[in-house]
A protein has these predicted regions:
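N-terminal targeting/trafficking signals and adjacent low-complexity tails
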Residues: 1-351
Length: 351
C-alpha cells in the first residue's frame, strides 16, 4: 500500500483555526493542557492517576448495555481492564448520524483505535481502551437524518418535534435500508452487511440502541466499547455538575473569558453560551431552562421551580436533565476527548 501525505494547509475542508492549530500549536498554548504529541501522554497519564474515578460504575453500565449484544473477546478484555487502576481510555464521540453518515464518523473511531494501539505499545504497563460515545441527546434531527451514497441522498423520514434523537423510535429505518440495498445491488459485498443492519433495526427499541448495535457490529473486533451517556446512573454521578450549571451558571464566565481570548487571536468563538446550558426533558421533548427572577421556568411548558425545588428535582431525577446541543461544560468534564493525534488530544482514566 502506498501512503502519501498531504499538507494540512492545502485541505480546504479544515477551518482557519484547525490549520493554525496543526501548524502553529504554540498559538494555542494558553488553551491546551498537553501538546498534541505522543510524548505528552506520559504527563497526561501521570496527571490522570491523581484523579478520583468511579470505575465500578462505568464497568457496570457498559456491562448492562452489552447484555444482549454480547462482547467480542477483545471487548471483554477491555471491559475487565476498566476496573484496573492502570487502565485509561481514549474517547471519541459523535452524534448518531444515519448509518454513520459522513465518513468523518468512521475516521474518528479509527483514530481512537489507532491512538489506543500506539499508546499500548509505548506504555506496556498501562492498558489503553478506545471508547466511542453516542451523542444521542442532540435534537438536531436534520443533521443526522440523511446520508449520501454514490452521490445519492437517502433521507430518514420520521416525525420529530424537539425530541432527543437518540430517544426516537426506529420507524422509517427499514425504508432507509431498502433504499441502500437498491443502490448497492445484490452482488455487492456490502449488501449482506446492510441485511444484518435490518435485523439490528428490527430488534431495537430506540434509534440510540440501533446506532449502538450498528457501531458495535462494525468495530467490536477492534475492542471498541460503545457508550450511550443518556443513562440515569451516569447522570446521577454527574448531578453535582448539573447543580453547579443550573443553579450557579458556573460555566458562563469561564467560557466567555476563553472565547474572548480566542477572539483576540483572530479566531471565531465556537459556541453561544447561555446562563443555563442544560435543558429539561418534558413529555419526551427537550426544553430550555430559563431563570426569571428567582424562578426556574421550563420554556414552552407550565412547569416552574423555586431554587430549592430545582435542587431537589436534580437530586431525585438527574435523568431529566441533558446537555445543550453544544455543551459548554468541557471545563468541568471528568472525561477525555481524544479524536486523534491530529486533533486536540487528552487522556483520562476510565470513569
Amino acid at each position: 500500500m502506498e501512503i502519501k501525505g498531504y499538507p494540512y494547509d492545502k485541505i480546504r475542508q479544515f477551518s482557519k483555526r484547525d490549520i493554525a492549530y496543526q501548524i502553529s500549536t504554540q498559538v494555542f498554548a494558553d488553551f491546551i493542557q498537553y501538546k498534541p504529541e505522543i510524548d505528552s501522554f506520559e504527563h497526561a497519564i501521570a496527571d490522570r492517576k491523581k484523579f478520583p474515578v468511579d470505575r465500578a460504575l462505568l464497568h457496570s453500565v457498559i456491562t448492562d448495555a452489552y447484555a444482549e449484544a454480547g462482547l467480542a473477546d477483545h471487548q471483554k478484555r477491555n471491559l475487565q481492564a476498566l476496573l484496573s487502576d492502570n487502565c485509561y481510555t481514549v474517547i471519541t464521540a459523535h452524534q448518531p448520524s444515519l448509518l454513520t453518515g459522513p465518513l468523518y464518523f468512521i475516521y474518528k473511531i479509527f483514530s481512537a483505535i489507532n491512538l489506543a494501539e500506539r499508546l499500548n505499545k509505548k506504555f506496556p504497563d498501562q492498558h489503553i481502551v478506545p471508547i466511542f460515545v453516542i451523542g444521542g441527546e442532540d435534537h438536531d434531527f436534520e443533521e443526522i437524518n440523511h446520508l449520501r451514497l454514490f452521490n445519492k441522498k437517502i433521507e430518514w423520514l420520521h416525525k420529530h418535534d424537539d425530541e432527543p434523537v437518540g430517544r426516537l423510535s426506529v420507524s422509517g429505518i427499514a425504508e432507509v435500508l431498502t433504499q441502500v440495498k437498491e443502490i448497492l445491488g445484490e452482488k455487492s459485498k456490502a449488501y449482506e452487511l446492510v441485511q444484518s443492519w435490518e435485523k439490528l433495526a428490527a430488534g431495537s427499541t430506540s434509534y440510540s440502541e440501533f446506532t449502538f448495535q450498528l457501531v458495535n457490529e462494525l468495530f467490536k473486533s477492534y475492542g471498541v466499547l460503545v457508550v450511550a451517556m443518556d443513562k440515569k446512573p451516569f447522570k446521577n454521578k454527574f448531578q453535582h455538575i448539573i447543580q453547579q450549571e443550573i443553579l450557579l451558571s458556573a460555566s458562563k464566565a469561564i467560557v466567555e473569558k476563553t472565547q474572548s481570548a480566542i477572539e483576540q487571536k483572530s479566531f471565531k468563538a465556537q459556541t453561544y453560551i447561555r446562563e443555563i446550558n442544560f435543558f429539561y426533558f418534558h413529555e419526551g421533548k427537550r426544553k430550555r431552562i430559563e431563570l426569571e427572577g428567582d424562578i426556574y421556568k421550563i420554556v414552552d411548558t407550565d412547569r416552574a421551580f423555586s431554587t430549592e425545588e430545582m435542587k431537589l428535582e436534580i437530586e431525585n431525577h438527574p435523568e431529566i436533565s441533558g446537555f445543550w446541543e453544544f455543551s459548554a461544560l468541557h471545563s468541568y468534564e471528568n472525561g477525555i476527548d481524544a479524536n486523534s493525534m491530529n486533533t486536540f488530544t487528552r487522556v483520562m482514566p476510565a470513569k
